UniProtKB/Swiss-Prot annotation:
Key word Nucleus present: no
Official protein name in the record: Peptide chain release factor 1
One Pfam family linked to the record: RF-1
One GO CC annotation: cytoplasm
InterPro entries linked: PCRF (IPR005139), Pep_chain_release_fac_I (IPR000352), Pep_chain_release_fac_I_sf (IPR045853), Prokaryotic/Mito_RF (IPR050057), RF-1 (IPR004373)
Organism, scientific name: Gloeothece citriformis (strain PCC 7424)
Amino acid sequence: MAEAYLLEKLKSVEQTYKELTRRLADPDIATNPDELQRVAKARSSLEETVNTYETWQKTKEEITGARQILKEAGGDSEMREMAALEVEELEEQLEQLENKLKVLLLPRDPNDDKNIMLEIRAGTGGDEASIWAGDLVRMYSRYAESQNWVVKLVSESLADMGGFKEAILEIKGDQVYSKLKFEAGVHRVQRVPVTEAGGRVHTSTATVAIMPEVDEVEVQIDPKDIEVSTARSGGAGGQNVNKVETAVDLFHKPTGIRIFCTEERSQLQNRERAMQILRAKLYEMKLREQQEAVSSMRRSQVGTGSRSEKIRTYNYKDNRVTDHRLGQNFSLVGALEGDIEVIIQSCIGKDQQERLAELANSPETAPVLN
């Protein structure tokens, strides 16, 4: 590798890791649980990079030793063959380790560790689009469960023929945003709808938005910009349903965003949930503007998360899911059951390749050490 800037960065990461390890051993930190958790999390985030760097250093030393044996083998053909084979194998290992280190050193998305609000809206296609939105709610719920994440439906607008006009899922767990951020965009389905008597294939769409959860400090909302009304809810609440107005209809005047929350048991809880969703929506709008600005400089094949970008087609007749960003096909049946990990990892890998290519073309990567 070893580009000079990468080696300097690795040494810096190693030094930070050692300092965090030293701090964890300090008895004083045990009296501050929040600080202990923060330091432990920071150290854990560097551990794979440091371990890989140590393996890379060890492999470099082994290559030097194997080359020395090859040099000293002289006329011993068997020894020369063994040493040459070892050098070849070690050089392959070294290349793999270098590629892994470059990926590990890519700048992390500050939102990657966050929980998300996943919004699904029925698009073109009438009743069938709403049914399709319901299928996507099920797909993402199944996938989240396979990742041991916690899923909760926090807002819904039911459609007459089944499914949803709109639904919002709250998904909590380990690195949720890092995996689901590439799911944002238009999901198109081609199939014979249950409402179609003639057996003709229809095309419908649903739009997915991925919104990192944010707190009040990250997104501040002026109370004067909010209009709130209440209504009787048909959600949880038993005999209170027809007596108490627990549902909350929140309207944000500057953006025109409207949120209707009925899933919680009290009006206060529904109001808090509506505000939480609004903060996530406003943050996602700001995030999209930033990503589109970056995208104008670097056209990402994986996509910017634009709501209007058609990212995937689900074809029932051919049992095929086509991801248009990857140019690859996957099994439809598996995907609809939530088995989309291979698609997600392919998107992550493509994004990493693009960012590595961009890094390689950057002027600051020019100096090289041997």
